[in-house]
Amino acid sequence: MSCSCLCMSLYRGADRIGRFYTAHCPQDMALCMHRQKLNPLALALAAAFALNAPAALADDEEPPIAVPAPPKEPGQTVVHADDMDGEMSVILHAKGNVVATRDDQRVESDWLDYYQTKNRVKAGDRFRMTRGGDVITGTTLDYNVDTYSGTGMDPVFSMARQNQTAVKPAPGAPPAKPVTLRGDGSQVDFQGQNQYRVYGSRMTTCDPGDEAWYLKSSRTDLDYNTGVGVAHNAWMQFYGVPILYSPWLDFPLNSNRKSGFLMPTFKTGSSGTEFSLPYYWNIAPNYDATITPHINVKHGNMLAGEFRYLQPDYSGRIYTEQLPKDKLTGESRYAWSASHSQNFGHGLSFGMDFNQVSDNNYFTDFGDQVAIASNVNLNREAWLNYALGWQGGGGNVTLRAQRYQNLTINPVPGDIPYAKMPQLTFNANQSLPSGFSANLISDLTRFDHPSLQNAERLVLYPSVSWNFDRSWGFLRPKLGVNYTHYNLDAFQGSPSHVQTRTLPIFSTDAGLYFDRDTQFLGRDHLMTLEPRLFYVNIPNNRDQNSLPMFDTSVNDINFAQLFTENRYSGYDRINGANQITTALTSRFIDQSNGLERLRLAVGKRFYLKDDVTQTVNQPSSDLLLSAGGDLTREWRFDSSYQYNQQLGMTERYNAQLRYNPAAGKIASVRYRFGRYEQLDNSNNYGPMRQVDVAAQWPIARRWYAIGRYNYSFIERKPIERLAGFEYNDGCWSLRMYSQRYVTDPTTTKNAWFFQLELKGLGALGNNGVQDTLRLAVPGYTKINE
C-alpha cells in the first residue's frame, strides 16, 4: 500500500529533536497513516518513545540504540529542524536551523513550511539554497522541489554549474569550462532545473569581494541548457561608471560558442577613428558567421562579414568588407577573401584561395602593419590534387590555376608576377633495393602576363639517389637530368619559337658525426664535431640570357642554400656548377638538462669553374658564420655573419640577445647590418643598419610596460616606435599603447590602441592588439593567461 509516512526518533538532551521525511512506506515501518491528523494513539506512541529514551550520555558512555530512519531514496524529501509540528500528509511546520534536502537540492532557513501534496516549500526569514553547484541566498522562498520552480526574494547568488550539454560542442572541441557568475537582484524566478530569471540584477565574474565591473540589468535570463545568459536593458559598469549600454546583451555561461554581440572595437590613428560592433551567429556546431558594422569617421560606414563552415570532408571561409562610398575618394571600396579545401576520398582533393581588393591603397587605408607588410601580391588559385600510392613508392598529380592581384603603386612590368594558367605537376618516388631510390619531378605550365612574353614551359627532372645513413655519418649521392622545353609566343615583333635545355646534374652530400664528453663552464657537456661536404657538378656551358624568367629569382645565400644544387628558385635558370661546399658545426649540449648551450657553425662554397649564368664570377662564395645557444634557461644568444672575402667587406650580420626569466618578462636587443638589402615592399634597396630593442616587463604590482624601438642609422630616424602599458587586475586587464611605423620612404602611419578585457566576457577594444604586440615584441605573453 502506498502512503505518506511520519517517523520521529527523539533524543533527550540533543539539539535536534526530530526528523521528517516522506516516501513509500518500507515493510518494517511502525507507523503509517492516510491523510488525517495525528490521533491520540500516535501521539502516545511517540511520547512513550521519548519518555523511555535514556538520558544524554557522557563522552565515555556507549550511545543509545535509536530507531533508524529508512535510507534516503531518489525523489525523497528530508527535513531536519529544531522544532516541527504539522498535519500528517498535508503540511509540516519546521523552525530553527531548518535543513530540507531532495536529490541535489538543499534549502537552509530559519523557518520552513512544507506542503506534502504539492511538494512545495515556503521558507524565511533567511534562506540559502544550493542546487547543481549554484548557491542562492535571500529573505523568503516559495519553491516546488518537484518542478525546480518558484520565487526567491532579495537573492544573492553564485552560479558555478556545468553546461547541461543541450547544445553539443563541435566534434573535437574541448569540453566547455564553467563560468562562475556572482551577483544579486530584487527577485529570482526558478524556471526549471537549469534556468533562472533574475530581476534588478547585478552580475560579475570577478572573485568574491571584487566588484571592479558588473553588468546591471532590469532582467537577466540564465539558461544552463544552452549555456547562454541574456541581459535586458543592460549597463556595463566599470568601478561604478557606466561604460556600455545595450537593450539586449547575451553572454556565455561557459566557454561554448554562442550567438550574440561580441565586444565592440575602438581604434584611432592615421586611418581615422573607428567603432565596430560584431555580431556572432553560431548557426550550428560546424557553421558560424560574424557580421560587423564599422563606423569610420574619416572614410564612412563599412560592413564586414565572415562565414565559416566545417564538414568531415571539406571546410572553408568567406570574408568581405564593403564600403559603398568612401568620404575621401567618393568611390566604392571593398575586400573579398575566400578559401575552400575538400577531400573527395581515394586520394583526390581540391582547394581554392581567392583574394581581391578594390584598389592598391586599400590595406594602406584600412589595414594595420601586419596587413600592409603581408599583402603585396594577393593570391588567387585553385588546385586539384590526386595522390597515388604503390608498393615501395608513391606520387601525386596536381592541376593548378594561379594569378595575383599586385598592389604595388606605379608598378613596372617586372613587379607583376606571371600567372600560371594552368600548371600541371607530377612528382613520384620509388624505393629500390640496397638503399637506392628513383625520383621524378615534372612540371608543365602556361605562363601568362599582361605586358611580357607568354609561353608554355615543360620541366622533366628524373633522378636516381642512394642513401647510406649510419649513426656516425651519411653519404647521399644523386644523379639526374633536367630537361626544359619552352614554346614561346610571338612578342614585340619576334615570332613564336621553341627553346630547349638539357642538363645532367650530379651531387653528393656527405657528413660525419663525432662527439665526446667534456667540461664547459664547469658543467658536464657533450661536445659534437660535425663536418659536412656537398659537391655539385652541372656541366652547363650555355648562355641562358635568351631564356625567359617566369618564376625565377636568385636565392639569398645562407646555410640552407649552401646545400642546394641550384642557386636560383624556379626552373628558368640553372647554374653551371663544379663546386664543393664545406661546413663544420660544433655543439655543446648540457648533459644534465639537454640544453644546447652553444652552437658554432662555419660554411663556404668553392667554385671549381666559372658559371655562365653569372656576369661576374668569384672563386668562392661569401664566408658564413653563426653562433648561438641557451647560455642559461633565461638568456638566449643568436648571431650570423656573412663576409665577402673578394671585396674584403662584410655583406650582412645579425646579432640578438634575449632575456626571458618568466612569462611576462621578456627583453631583447637586436642589431642588423646589410650592405644591400630590400628596405620595403616597394622594392627599394640600399644599405641597412638598424637596432631593434623590445621588451615586456613588470614595473609595479600588476603593471607591465611594453615597448619597441627600431632605429635606422642610415635614415637617421625610427622605423617603428611602440610604447604603452598593461594592467592585470585578475578580474580585468587593460592595454593601452601607441604605435608609429614607416610603410614606405614617404609614408608614416600612426595608431593608438585600447583594450579592456573583462574576465569571463572577453575584450573591449581593438581586436588586433594581440597580433600587433606579438609581432612587435618577440616572446610577448598575454598577461592574463
Curated annotation (Swiss-Prot):
Which locations, inside or outside the cell, does it occupy? Cell outer membrane
Q: Which cysteines are joined by disulfide bonds?
A: none
A GO cellular component annotated for this chain's UniProt record is: transporter complex
Q: Which GO terms describe its biological process?
A: Gram-negative-bacterium-type cell outer membrane assembly; lipopolysaccharide transport
Where is it mainly found?
membrane
User: Signal sequence: where?
Assistant: 1-58
Note the InterPro entries from the entry: LipoPS_assembly_LptD, LptD, LptD_C
Q: What Pfam families does the record tag this protein with? A: LptD
Question: What are the UniProt keywords, alphabetically?
Answer: Cell outer membrane, Membrane, Signal
State whether it acts alone or in a complex, and with which partners, per the record. Component of the lipopolysaccharide transport and assembly complex. Interacts with LptE and LptA.
- PANTHER family reported for this sequence: LPS-ASSEMBLY PROTEIN, LPS-ASSEMBLY PROTEIN LPTD
Q: Give the family from UniProt.
A: Belongs to the LptD family.
HAMAP family assigned: LPS_assembly_LptD
Q: What does this protein do?
A: Together with LptE, is involved in the assembly of lipopolysaccharide (LPS) at the surface of the outer membrane.
Q: What is this protein called?
A: LPS-assembly protein LptD
Which organism is the protein's source? Chromobacterium violaceum (strain ATCC 12472 / DSM 30191 / JCM 1249 / CCUG 213 / NBRC 12614 / NCIMB 9131 / NCTC 9757 / MK)
Q: What is the lineage of its organism?
A: Bacteria, Pseudomonadati, Pseudomonadota, Betaproteobacteria, Neisseriales
